Structures are given as C-alpha cells and as structure tokens.
C-alpha cells in the first residue's frame, strides 16, 4: 500500500490532470488505485450544487469538479465522499473562518482508510505546497508528517522555472522523496515550451515522468500513456511505503 502526493507549482497548473494520468497509468499495470483530494474549494466554474439529501461533502452543499474527475478516473467503486474530506463553495477556506472546520484527524483517518483498502492512493493537494491547510499546518507540513513521496506538476508557462525550483527546494528540505515531475502544457501558444522543459530537466534532481500536451477537456480523455516513466512509480510504490 502506498500514497503519492501530487503537488503543483501553483494553482491551475494541472494537478487533477496529472493525478488522472497517474491513476490511469497505474491501473494499466494492474494496480488497485484511487484518487483522494482532502480539501476541495474553487470558484463558480468548477462547483456544482446538489440537493441537500444528495450532499456528499462535509459542509457546503456542492460537489467539486476535481473530485468528480478523480472519482471517474478510477475503476474502483468509490463515492464522492470516499475520496474527499471537505468541499467548500468558495475559493479559499483558509482565508475565512471555514478553516476552523478542517480537522487533520479526519483527513488522516480518511487517508488511512483508503490506504488500507487500495494498493495505491494518489493524493491531490490544493493550491501550492506551502498553502496553509489546517490547524496552523501547511500541505508541506502534512506530507512531511505522513512521510509521503511527492510528484511535482509543473504547468509550463513563463515564470514556471522559478516556481518549480523553489518548490523542489522545499520538498528537499521536508526530507520526503521527490519521485519525479510531470510537465503539463497549459499554454498552447508558448513558443519556447521545449526549451523550458529542457531547462527543468537540467535543473530538477528527479526524473521527468512524462509530458502532457495541451488538451481540450483532459478530464474526459485517456492520459496514462503520456507518463512514459511509469516504472519509477511502480518501483517507489514498493520501496518507500509498504
């Protein structure tokens, strides 16, 4: 059993797309794998209201598009509530009193339950790695406590090299393994895409797991084949967390 944490260099860099690719790639190797997004929060474009009797989130009566994508990416029979601990209708509970509702004990229990049920859990964070999570701790603090290996998603755009290298430095300071990184093309008009990826390959001391091109509705597509270094994930699954 193992968990991987999918960290992004920023918000809207494609963490959910990369998590879907990881889930599909691992399933292609026969691994029983699910996604897990502890805290889901976003704007109007990615939440959907549900009737109160159908509410699957802990507090607000909404479901989140990222959690739905994770739910529909796995072949395992999971519900929305199985793979999400908290859903909020606004973009950042850490900026409001809602942050007081988030309890790490619940998140830890939910992750333990998934780890005990499935061979692998792909955990998707919210916003960036240093974003406050709950009870005075950041996502970085939490994954260090969990000793959870990290896969870094880099949304390839101007400025991403600085963001990526700073995030890598934080991961190294945490003392958790950086399994590798995924290049996600989020700007189809970026003329120097290849040069940026080459520069990141040169400076990130971890393997490139794959390159996901700019895609229309990636949440509806097969993405696993874009991860060309899946052996790295399979190896780490057995080496780091049993």
Swiss-Prot record:
Major enzyme class: ligase
GO MF annotation: an example: ATP binding
Alphabetical list of CDD domains matching this protein: DTBS
Gene3D superfamilies from the UniProt entry: P-loop containing nucleotide triphosphate hydrolases (3.40.50.300)
InterPro entries assigned to the protein according to its UniProt record, in alphabetical order: DTB_synth_BioD, P-loop_NTPase
Reaction catalysed by this enzyme: (7R,8S)-7,8-diammoniononanoate + CO2 + ATP = (4R,5S)-dethiobiotin + ADP + phosphate + 3 H(+)
Keywords: ATP-binding, Biotin biosynthesis, Cytoplasm, Ligase, Magnesium, Metal-binding, Nucleotide-binding
Biochemical pathway: Cofactor biosynthesis; biotin biosynthesis; biotin from 7,8-diaminononanoate: step 1/2
Enzyme Commission code(s) on record: 6.3.3.3
GO cellular component: cytosol
Necessary cofactors: Mg(2+)
Localization per record: Cytoplasm
One Pfam family linked to the record: AAA_26
Family: Belongs to the dethiobiotin synthetase family.
Entries under HAMAP family matching the protein: BioD
Record PANTHER family: DETHIOBIOTIN SYNTHETASE
SUBUNIT field: Homodimer.
Protein's recorded name: ATP-dependent dethiobiotin synthetase BioD 1
């Amino acid at each position: 059993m193992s968990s991987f944490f999918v960290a992004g260099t920023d918000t809207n860099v494609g963490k959910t797309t990369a998590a879907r690719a990881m889930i599909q790639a691992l399933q292609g190797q026969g691994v029983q794998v699910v996604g897990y997004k502890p805290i889901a929060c976003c704007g109007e474009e990615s939440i959907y209201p549900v009737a109160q009797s159908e509410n699957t989130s802990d507090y607000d009566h909404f479901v989140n598009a990222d959690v739905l994508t994770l739910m529909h990416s796995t072949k395992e029979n999971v519900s929305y509530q199985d793979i999400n601990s908290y859903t909020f209708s606004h973009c950042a509970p850490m900026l409001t009193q809602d942050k007081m509702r988030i309890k790490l004990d619940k998140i830890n229990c939910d992750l333990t339950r998934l780890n005990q049920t499935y061979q692998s859990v792909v955990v998707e964070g919210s916003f960036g790695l240093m974003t406050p999570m709950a009870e005075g701790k950041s996502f970085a603090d939490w994954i260090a406590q969990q000793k959870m290996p990290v896969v870094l998603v880099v949304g390839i755009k101007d400025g991403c090299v600085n963001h990526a290298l700073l995030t890598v430095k934080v991961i190294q300071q945490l003392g958790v393994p950086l399994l590798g990184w995924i290049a996600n093309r989020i700007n189809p008009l970026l003329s120097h895409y290849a040069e940026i990826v080459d520069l990141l390959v040169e400076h990130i001391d971890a393997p490139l797991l794959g390159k996901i091109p700019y895609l229309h509705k990636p949440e509806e597509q097969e993405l696993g084949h874009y991860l060309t270094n899946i052996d790295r994930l399979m190896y780490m699954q057995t080496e780091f967390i049993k």
